[in-house]
A protein has these predicted regions:
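Extended, highly charged alpha-helical segments
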Residues: 120-121, 131-178
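N-terminal accessory targeting/assembly segments
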Residues: 1-134
């Protein structure tokens, strides 16, 4: 008999060290985030931290740290033959704005395959924040249909502004009429 194992997601965790959140507290928060990920069935494989005065408004982390995260994901993809699993999700410790999620997903899910500097899509690594992770845990554990509906509503209300303009590349496409 063939045994089918459930797919286990692997995650990268990201946190910031700021003047109001010292390194030790960031480490504690990332430990808690790792526990939440594990509770949801996601295996944390790497942690990234960056020291900033405040989060980058466009991408939460700086350009160099974002590139470091992206390169780590690419290296894991390229070393799959060595038994390393792909990174499926990047989890940020703080709440991300809709713009930050879009920018992060765009940056993380593109890479240069030709050597020409042109970036090509290479995967669908999800970007989520602590709140989304907690909502997903609640949804996973909800027992009654009412509870599932309530959690799903909360999740959708949280995600609505994050989905706005997701398909903005279609904005200018209009049907022609004769």
């Amino acid at each position: 008999m063939i045994e089918i194992k459930p797919y286990i997601e692997h995650a990268v965790l990201v946190g910031l060290i700021t003047p109001s959140q010292p390194e030790e507290r960031t480490k504690e928060y990332l430990d808690e985030l790792a526990f939440l990920a594990d509770t949801h069935g996601i295996v944390p494989v790497k942690r990234f931290t960056q020291r900033l005065d405040q989060p980058n408004t466009a991408t939460y982390v700086g350009e160099g740290k974002l590139e470091e995260i992206r390169q780590y994901i690419i290296e894991r993809e390229e070393s799959r033959d060595e038994g390393r699993e792909l990174v499926d999700v990047v989890i940020f410790d703080d709440e991300l704005s809709p713009r930050q999620i879009r920018n992060l997903e765009k940056a993380i899910n593109h890479r240069d395959r030709s050597g020409s500097g042109a970036k090509q899509p290479f995967g669908s690594v999800r970007v989520i924040d602590r709140t989304i992770l907690i909502l997903e845990i609640f949804l996973q554990r909800a027992q009654t249909s009412y509870a599932k509906t309530q959690v799903e509503m909360a999740h959708l209300q949280y995600m609505l502004p994050r989905l706005t303009r997701m398909w903005s590349h279609l904005d200018r496409q209009r049907g022609g009429g004769g």
